[in-house]
């Protein structure tokens, strides 16, 4: 799969798009109180940093004159966030979603929660800035199969291909409608190894193909092909055989790659 850049043109027929209320848009020049924002952020995140044993969820405060970057994704992104943030430390302020982003159907509700919770006017003296770059991925939680709440290949798939494409198109429209000045970067879904629990090897290829079909309509959304970047190192980077997650060698390399791609848009 070759990394490409696509640029997107809005045009969605009858698809219903969730639009952030005007009240979510911060008024420029209003005071932001770091203590209030930090407290709100810590409440929003809860103990997720302890669960994942990472500082990816530590509070970061916007800095005057620095671009504001948001990383949205699942546990793969949770692991590489800290390295991406470190690589861009002198160039941008890198935020991430307050939780594991989950499947494509969770994207818009999660983004709305972030805006409603952390930004003015909903939070008095809260964040007061616009996103300059949003780097996002959905897919690994769409292609999985669940029986109840447990990963099980005999269970039901979270999102069919058609559902995934519909959700991703809605996501693109949502981002363009609510964050029109933000540069958007979509990261392809990383590989599913053989014998993965609740996931079938090769499904990432199928879902990435579907994603690229959607993104062809949005050529200004850049593609960060993390699948292609990761695939040659799957065996050496995997935490263990059959695990979709990566050990430090892998997620540090992914973090550097994500930072490199983001930097091209700064």
Across the structure, where does each feature detected by a protein language model lie?
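A short helix->loop->beta-strand "cap" motif at the edges of active sites that frequently abuts
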Residues: 179-183
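Substrate-gating cap/lid alpha-helix
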Residues: 189-226
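Generic structural signal for well-ordered alpha-helices
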Residues: 168-172, 208
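C-terminal segment of N-terminal export signals and the immediately downstream linker at the start
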Residues: 1, 21-45, 49-50
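Conserved SGNH/GDSL esterase-like catalytic core that processes O-acyl groups on lipids
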Residues: 41-166
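Short acidic/His/Gly/Ser-rich catalytic and metal-binding motifs that mark active-site loops
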Residues: 142-148, 194-195, 231-236
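Histidine-centered active-site loop/cap adjacent to the catalytic His
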Residues: 239-266
């Amino acid at each position: 799969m070759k990394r490409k850049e696509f640029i997107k043109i809005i045009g969605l027929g009858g698809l219903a798009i969730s639009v952030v209320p005007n009240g979510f848009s911060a008024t420029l020049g209003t005071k932001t109180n770091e203590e209030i924002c930090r407290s709100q952020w810590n409440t929003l995140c809860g103990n997720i940093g302890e669960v994942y044993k990472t500082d990816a969820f530590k509070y970061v405060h916007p800095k005057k004159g620095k671009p504001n970057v948001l990383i949205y994704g699942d546990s793969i992104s949770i692991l590489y966030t800290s390295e991406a943030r470190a690589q861009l430390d002198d160039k941008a302020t890198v935020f991430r979603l307050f939780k594991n982003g989950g499947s494509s159907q969770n994207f818009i509700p999660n983004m709305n929660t972030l805006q409603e919770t952390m930004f003015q006017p909903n939070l008095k003296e809260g964040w007061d800035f616009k996103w300059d770059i949003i780097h996002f991925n959905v897919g690994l939680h769409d292609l999985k199969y669940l029986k109840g709440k447990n990963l099980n290949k005999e269970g039901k798939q979270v999102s069919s291909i058609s559902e995934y494409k519909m959700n991703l198109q809605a996501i693109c429209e949502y981002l363009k409608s609510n964050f029109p000045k933000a540069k958007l970067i979509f990261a392809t879904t990383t590989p599913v190894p053989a014998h993965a629990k609740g996931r079938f090897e090769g499904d990432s290829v199928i879902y990435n193909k579907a994603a690229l079909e959607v993104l062809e309509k949005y050529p200004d959304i850049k593609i960060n092909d993390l699948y292609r970047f990761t695939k040659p190192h799957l065996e050496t980077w995997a935490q263990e055989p059959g695990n979709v997650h990566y050990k430090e060698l892998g997620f540090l390399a992914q973090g550097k790659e994500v930072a490199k791609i983001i930097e091209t848009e700064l």
